Amino acid sequence: MDELGFHRTLHRPGTLLDVGAHEGGFTLPLAALPGSRVLAFEPLPESFARLRAAAGQLAHVTLRQEALGDATGEAVLRLPVVEGVANAQWASLAKRYDGFGPQVGERRVTVPLRRLDEFGLDDLTAVKLDAEGAEYEVLRGAVETLRRCRPVLSIEIEERHRPGSTWAVPAFLDALGYDAFWEHWGAWRPMAEFDRATMQVASADPSVFAASDPYVFVFYVLPREQAPAMLDRLRRAEAGAVSPPAP
């Protein structure tokens, strides 16, 4: 099951949060789910312009040209520039790219920074989070919302983006009453079975993913009080016994 399948299977009407929306590749499928209202954050101006062109006419989609974190104000977003070409998909608040080599530099963009808790959401049912190493800060700024709404989450976490993040983020969520899982070939495994020493070997070289089999970087996080029932639904969906909601 892929990340979108996870959200389709566990979909409940309400607000769906897309953090790191980029150009809308996840925003639009979320918006197609019945009874959904999507709140999408993308701070990079050029990516936000494409996101707005793709989804800006949808009345139930709200787009914010802001970054999320654990403070309010401004932050510096860094993009790697290789051979003079900037890579928007790797834009990060947590990483620095200058010094990687003679042909690698970085472009810096100052962006607005908000905490999710400022928005006072009371119907958040799902979160997709891809913040290129800043996931911990995003979650710290969302504690009140997570406690109040108990959404499900899918989070990309990689040691190559931020060393220590594969234990720090799940530990933070564990303290909030959440359990993290990863999936491989239909098997849903607890975070305790994740081996960062063998399952993220590509952290040493971002261009080589074959070094880990599997390379695990998407983690699925469930409210502890609902985890058994949700895992059962996910497993039955993998087996074809549960159909996702029709758009």
Please place each PLM-identified region on the residue numbering.
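Phosphate/nucleotide-binding beta-alpha loop and adjacent structural elements of enzyme active sites
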Residues: 1-247
